[in-house]
Amino acid sequence: MGDPERPEAAGLDLDERSSSDTNDNEIKSNEEPLLRKSSRRFVIFPIQYPDIWKMYKQAQASFWTAEEVDLSKDLPHWNKLKADEKYFISHILAFFAASDGIVNENLVERFSQEVQVPEARCFYGFQILIENVHSEMYSLLIDTYIRDPKKREFLFNAIETMPYVKKKADWALRWIADRKSTFGERVVAFAAVEGIFFSGSFAAIFWLKKRGLMPGLTFSNELISRDEGLHCDFACLMFQYLVNKPSEERVREIIVDAVQIEQEFLTEALPVGLIGMNCILMKQYIEFVADRLLVELGFSKIFQAENPFDFMENISLEGKTNFFEKRVSEYQRFAVMAETTDNVFTLDADF
């Protein structure tokens, strides 16, 4: 007897099976309010999803550019770092420089085309813009610190030159290319990319801030981690609106897979011990972040991990932490979050 799990056993060849899966996903998409095609997608008002719109306005209010980050004090600090510290920082920056482009690939190729709700499309459009700013910032940091053109080229091509960066990139790229997975599964996967794959590296750079090092690097990291926290929160909000959510078992499978890759990245491939951090505590921190993401998605914790890094308590890996309310370093655009009725323009001022 043939294996019942094999496609031919069910009377389908692989192409037919793939077509069947695609059709199933199309049927499920029609059941999803977020994905249902409508001419309403071309017009923003009246707002149908005020919470999604509010997140878009929050992202808009947080806009910044690479030119606004002062790197003048970083180079003297860089020149005083140990070789291990330089190695670690440069390779982390190489990972980040490539990763934002991958996130944008997903937004352009998949999410922006699949989601039909204009409020969400506004958010994704702005996310694409700010991810480009992040990528420019990381590239500028590499350009500033690394003077050797060959080393610089090696870092800019990290997906090809560094196996451990390639492993993380391949995991994310696989989800972009996957035509069988549901929208909900891919929302979880990219929440894991921005909420888990970035978390340990953010923590490592904040560790440098605690030591008073590299003010330009650490300030840009503060802004970027705030942005990524908001993106992760937005993914969780989109997930809550889904009618056909993936099962808790499937969500846990995706999250655990991401946790294992990130733990390997920062404790074996590019160990945080190089900058004096504790690898065991870093593993715990990644588990803590994963638990927090699971709760925000509406599921129970897996690891029951405590946050081992006190300096990360107020850091914006949740978009709604102190960062936004405190107007971090004044990087909140004037009046963007104000009610429209507050913005009254008159011509009766005294000149």
Curated annotation (Swiss-Prot):
Cofactor remark from the record:
Binds 2 iron ions per subunit.
Positions bound to Fe cation 2: 131, 194, 228, 231
Instruction: State a GO cellular component annotated for this protein.
Output: nucleus
The record's function comment reads: Plays a pivotal role in cell survival by repairing damaged DNA in a p53/TP53-dependent manner. Supplies deoxyribonucleotides for DNA repair in cells arrested at G1 or G2. Contains an iron-tyrosyl free radical center required for catalysis. Forms an active ribonucleotide reductase (RNR) complex with RRM1 which is expressed both in resting and proliferating cells in response to DNA damage.
Q: Where is the active site?
A: 138
User: EC?
Assistant: 1.17.4.1
Q: What is this protein called?
A: Ribonucleoside-diphosphate reductase subunit M2 B
Taxonomic placement: Eukaryota, Metazoa, Chordata, Craniata, Vertebrata
Q: Which cofactor does it need?
A: Fe cation
Instruction: Please list the reactions this protein catalyses.
Output: a 2'-deoxyribonucleoside 5'-diphosphate + [thioredoxin]-disulfide + H2O = a ribonucleoside 5'-diphosphate + [thioredoxin]-dithiol
Assembly and partners are described as: Heterotetramer with large (RRM1) subunit. Interacts with p53/TP53. Interacts with RRM1 in response to DNA damage. DNA damage.
Family, similarity comment:
Belongs to the ribonucleoside diphosphate reductase small chain family.
**Presence of keyword DNA damage:** yes
Q: Which GO terms describe its biological process?
A: deoxyribonucleotide biosynthetic process; DNA repair
What would be the name of the gene that encodes this protein?
Answer: RRM2B
